[in-house]
Design a protein with these regions (language model features):
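ABC ATPase nucleotide-binding domains
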Residues: 1-48
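Asparagine-centered polar/low-complexity signal
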Residues: 30, 60, 87-88
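Nucleotide phosphate-binding site architecture
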Residues: 35, 41-45, 53, 77, ...
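Residues located in well-ordered beta-strands
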Residues: 39, 51, 91-95
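C-terminal boundary and immediately downstream tail of ABC-type ATPase nucleotide-binding domains
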Residues: 45-66, 71-74
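Non-catalytic connector elements of ABC transporters
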Residues: 68-151
Length: 151
């Protein structure tokens, strides 16, 4: 209806799914202040701050020195047999596995990087035969890291 009428609407919601589905422009607020105003696609793919990355979801926030980066949960590869190719893997333990229908959310723990969430298709998960408690190699491409602002 909004698009048919061509009228600007302001829709206040706490449902992220609803906001991302309906909005042509979305505002993420923190403590009464707008911290990012962007299209839903940019909010999800290019969060400006760690708060936005964590609020929108689907990201891990990594700290390296004074800088923070967002890394999408579906950008992390898991290899139960160790590293492959030129990837520089991080060794992690599978802490939890949550089945979500066609996807599987995996919680990993590493002393260097704390907790990581990984999202993969159920097909890929079953091919890899992953289990809770298993030690695995994890990797990602450096171009999948998104630099976050300090605030």
């Amino acid at each position: 209806m909004q698009r048919e009428l061509g009228i600007t609407f302001i829709h206040v919601t706490h449902s992220q799914e609803e906001a991302l589905a309906l909005a042509s422009l979305a505002v993420v607020m923190n403590e009464g202040k707008a911290v990012q105003i962007d299209t839903p696609l940019k909010l999800f793919n290019k969060p400006r701050t760690a708060f936005v990355a964590e609020f929108v979801g689907g990201h891990n926030v990594l700290k390296h020195g004074e800088k923070s980066f967002a890394l999408r949960t579906d950008s992390i590869g898991i290899d139960p047999d160790g590293p492959s190719g030129t990837n520089k893997p991080f060794e992690m333990n599978i802490v939890d596995i949550e089945f979500q229908g066609s996807r599987v959310k995996i919680l990993l723990n590493s002393s260097e990087h704390n907790l990581f969430n990984v999202l993969m298709s159920d097909y890929e998960f079953y091919k890899k035969e992953l289990e809770t408690g298993q030690r695995v190699s994890c990797f990602w491409n450096s171009e999948d890291l998104h630099l976050l602002e300090d605030h």
